[in-house]
From Swiss-Prot:
PROSITE patterns: SAICAR_SYNTHETASE_1, SAICAR_SYNTHETASE_2. GO terms for molecular function: ATP binding; phosphoribosylaminoimidazolesuccinocarboxamide synthase activity. It comes from Syntrophobacter fumaroxidans (strain DSM 10017 / MPOB). Keywords: ATP-binding, Ligase, Nucleotide-binding, Purine biosynthesis. Belongs to the SAICAR synthetase family. The gene is purC. HAMAP family: SAICAR_synth (MF_00137). This is Phosphoribosylaminoimidazole-succinocarboxamide synthase. Pfam families: SAICAR_synt. Its EC number is 6.3.2.6. One of its GO terms (cellular component) is cytoplasm. GO terms for biological process: 'de novo' IMP biosynthetic process.
Length: 301
């Protein structure tokens, strides 16, 4: 394993079968279930940065756990437990590393699409709208401004790219062709329901949920929410008290890092630059504030 138990860049657990190493998570095959470990790696523009962000994996896991509990009346999810003492026996030797940054989950047949929902005009959606008056092929009213709330949330699926590649927006019809019309409609409906419940709650906690992405799959034939949920890695979180239509506010997510990289002149290709200590620490603070605002607790709470 690279790093101490408090700073994890990569995991290596002899005796456990590594199934996949993603941008952030290492996934191990436990037979009829999976072990998902959130490392402290951070990526931007689909490239993994060379230095990690302390506590990031623990923060992401805490936030995902919170949302899975909160949303359990809207959709089933894949979580079995995040209590390492309940994990299969072969995981126990690695308890010190796994504690706080891992989840034991059901195996799912994951759909090959990212389920993106947008409630506000931001990021690539804003750029698309400026050029075409649409977002991912969905026509919107004329005259909208950056960061403006949309008349209603829109569902804009994308492909799931392999590591180092870029996701590509696809139409709902293309998604339906991939997973079936009825299933695609079900996924779209649940995605919107989850967003509406989560965004309403987040607003009460002083956060605007501008957009986010989910993954779904089938567990024993039932639609199931999988992977991370409503984290600063997968979502755009804005502080409500600093929100203004017409400009993109500071946020509790990766946008701070993206903005730094753009200013640095990096060309969004390998090799990425080493992040300065202040950028790492400020990124950590933003992630931690998202956890504290949303859940009411910090890492030790």
């Amino acid at each position: 394993m690279s790093g101490s138990p408090d700073l994890v860049l990569e995991t290596d657990f002899p005796g456990l079968k590594l199934l996949n190493r993603g941008k952030v998570r290492d996934i191990y095959d436990l037979g009829d279930s999976l072990l998902i470990v959130a490392t402290d790696r951070i990526s931007a523009f689909d490239v993994i940065m060379p230095n990690p962000v302390p506590d990031k994996g623990r923060i992401l896991t805490r936030i995902t756990e919170f949302w899975l509990r909160f949303l359990s009346d809207v959709t089933e999810n894949h979580l079995i437990s995040s209590d390492v003492s309940r994990y299969p026996e072969q995981c126990r030797p690695y308890e010190r590393v796994l504690a706080g940054r891992s989840m034991w989950v059901k195996k799912a047949r994951v759909f090959p699409v990212e389920c993106i929902v947008r409630g506000y005009l931001a990021g690539s959606g804003w750029e698309d709208y400026r050029k075409t008056g649409q977002v991912c092929g969905i026509a919107l009213p004329a005259g909208l401004q950056e960061a403006q709330q949309l008349p209603e949330p829109i569902f804009t699926p994308s492909t799931k790219a392999t590591l180092g590649e870029h996701d590509e927006n696809i139409s709902f019809d293309a998604m339906a062709a991939a997973i079936g019309e009825e299933m695609a409609q079900g996924v779209r409906d649940v995605t919107i329901k989850v967003y509406l419940k989560a965004s309403s709650y987040a607003r009460q906690r002083g956060i605007i949920l501008a957009d986010t992405k989910f993954e779904f799959g089938l567990v024993e034939g039932r639609l199931t929410l999988v992977d991370e949920v409503l984290t600063p890695d997968s979502s755009r979180f804005w502080p409500a008290d600093r929100y203004r239509v017409g400009s993109s506010p500071e946020s509790f997510d990766k946008q701070y890092l993206r903005d730094y990289l753009v200013r640095s002149g990096w060309k969004k290709t390998d090799p990425p630059p080493v992040l300065p200590p202040d950028v790492v620490e400020n990124t950590r603070k933003r992630y931690l504030e998202a956890l504290e605002r949303l859940s009411g607790h910090g890492l030790e709470g």
